[in-house]
Amino acid sequence: MQSPAATAEGLSGPLFGAYTFPTFKFQPRHDSMDWRRISTLDVDRVARELDVATLQENIAGITFCNLDREVCSRCGQPVDPALLKVLRLAQLIIEYLLHCQDCLSASVAQLEARLQTSLGQQQRGQQELGRQADELKGVREESRRRRKMISTLQQLLMQTGTHSYHTCHLCDKTFMNATFLRGHIQRRHAGVAEGGKQKKQEQPVEEVLEELRAKLKWTQGELEAQREAERQRQLQEAELIHQREIEAKKEFDKWKEQEWTKLYGEIDKLKKLFWDEFKNVAKQNSTLEEKLRALQSHSVMESKLGSLRDEESEEWLRQARELQALREKTEIQKTEWKRKVKELHEEHMAEKKELQEENQRLQASLSQDQKKAAAQSQCQISTLRAQLQEQARIIASQEEMIQSLSLRKVEGIHKVPKAVDTEEDSPEEEMEDSQDEQHKVLAALRRNPTLLKHFRPILEDTLEEKLESMGIRKDAKGISIQTLRHLESLLRVQREQKARKFSEFLSLRGKLVKEVTSRAKERQENGAVVSQPDGQPSVKSQQSTLVTREAQPKTRTLQVALPSTPAEPPPPTRQSHGSHGSSLTQVSAPAPRPGLHGPSSTPPSSGPGMSTPPFSSEEDSEGDRVQRVSLQPPKVPSRMVPRPKDDWDWSDTETSEENAQPPGQGSGTLVQSMVKNLEKQLEAPAKKPAGGVSLFFMPNAGPQRAATPGRKPQLSEDESDLEISSLEDLPLDLDQREKPKPLSRSKLPEKFGTGPQSSGQPRVPAW
């Protein structure tokens, strides 16, 4: 326990400041103990509940009571001296602790007062500090302005030079002119010597100016060096970024080219596979139809030996087995196609997913221009996806076509009569049928013209893809001369490749050239034999062997001169002709549109007056094919109408509109005789070259009304590989009433099948 002196010393330490400890002495004790009150207290409860209030109430009575006269209530003996001593010592301790408590309370109150005072002083000090900081900020701003002003004045001083100012040699003042300086010297420095002091004043000023000039030059050099270094660093960074963009673009282009090549290869394989399967099915169908036709032809033959008993059941069973085998094979092929399409679709989806991930990764690192290129690639991918869907639709249509052919064969087999000669079904006949399968396909297509409508979208898509591969868009109305020259070189290379691939290519071309030339000569000779009316010029040539090259490349015409019709023509006549079961329709040309081309003063054989098709296909030759057949009289101006884009589409409405001709016009008989001769020549079948596709014509539907005279037909065809064999089967039935006028390419499809009965006749579908 500390002594009172130590306690006083602790209270008067630095923590409590200069607090004075009051004088302490023990008080006398005269009060008696209140035993009744003590007996009511529960000491255990006070200790358990920490009842400090009860202790505070009883502390005074216990501390200041006198226990010397206390005796035991039971035995009446006084309190034990040792116990009494302990109780008195406890009273003294409690009294001292109460004194310490009072001192501490007073010290705490004093310290709280001092704390409040210190807090007030601190707040005032902070306010003063903020005010001084504001003042310091203002002083700094003022100092900065003054430094700027001084530097500006120094720069002006260095720029203008010291000779512009007049400095007093006796003080630091400077004047604008010498008058002010003299006045200043007279006022302030009268009678003062000038020599030594002026020199002392000029030397420090010159030194300061030189030092400032040196610092300025050094600062400018440092700034220039820093600018140059920063410029070099920016150039290097820009070059590095540009190189990275170029490398990323090259990688993206290479990857895109590889993916395009892979996709085109897969599409070509799939198209080739489907085309081979379709050819096989068509061959089988044509074979069965030929057998059915043979059975039908044999059924009408009557035996002169009497009624014979035919083996109908065996023949019917054999045909049923063949039909069942064909159905099974068709189902197998269909299943195989579906499986292959599914595999290709799964592979395409996997590749598409990989390409999308790769595309996203590349797009994150591409610049704005490369993102635009990636968007264009995405559009092309969408186009290819649409083409694949179109291919699937075409496959479905082919399957429906195969089913329809199979059903038709079943009906034909059930209609076979009983009188069948079993000896005709020999292996030799099957061999001949397999060799003539192409002719059977043609016959089947003639009997069912609706099948050709299914092939038209396929051929249109193929042609559009081929044109797009050569750089010609689908909606292009024409091509430039530079593009035409590029396509000419490309087609020339492709023709050379085909000539190397197919050994008979050149010989077939030569054969076709000779055949066309010979037919043109025959038509010319036949046309020259026909007599002419009086006052009319003679026939020059029907088709010249010279193929005139037009001003625009890839356009060739064959000129045919026809005589003018008499002033009063005979009444209209009707005629019908047939070749290979196809109808030859009369050609009637509408009046040319005056807004398109004006009349030409030169004969139509001259090049610049002709129109050029927007493109030529890859199978075109240099000068051995007919693109336009022009039938014109001499000294008659011609009008050319550009060929529209969709010249394959025509309708009954268009043909009926073209048939509305003004009455009262006559015609000659020259064209009729020429058409008959041409039909006889075209009836002979010609060998189809490799890669050629025939144009099939429908059976003749009846006579047709003669076309309006006063027109000169001009027939033209695209130079494509689909038209190599079209010259063998193309009928040109020219009306005997026609007066020669140019027939434009845009109106050519509308002329076939016109007349009073044209709406009921089947159209001539073309591939």
Curated annotation (Swiss-Prot):
- Provenance organism: Homo sapiens
Which InterPro entries does the annotation name?
DZIP1_N (IPR032714), DZIP_RILPL (IPR051241), Znf_C2H2_type (IPR013087)
Q: Name one molecular function that GO assigns to this entry.
A: zinc ion binding
Q: Where is the composition biased (Low complexity)?
A: 607-616
Q: Where is the composition biased (Polar residues)?
A: 533-547, 574-588, 658-675
Q: Give GO cellular component annotations, separated by semicolons.
A: axoneme; centriole; ciliary basal body; cilium; cytoplasm; cytosol; intercellular bridge; microtubule cytoskeleton
Query: What is the recorded name of this protein?
Result: Cilium assembly protein DZIP1L
Coiled-coil positions are 205-406
Family to which the UniProt record says this protein belongs = Belongs to the DZIP C2H2-type zinc-finger protein family.
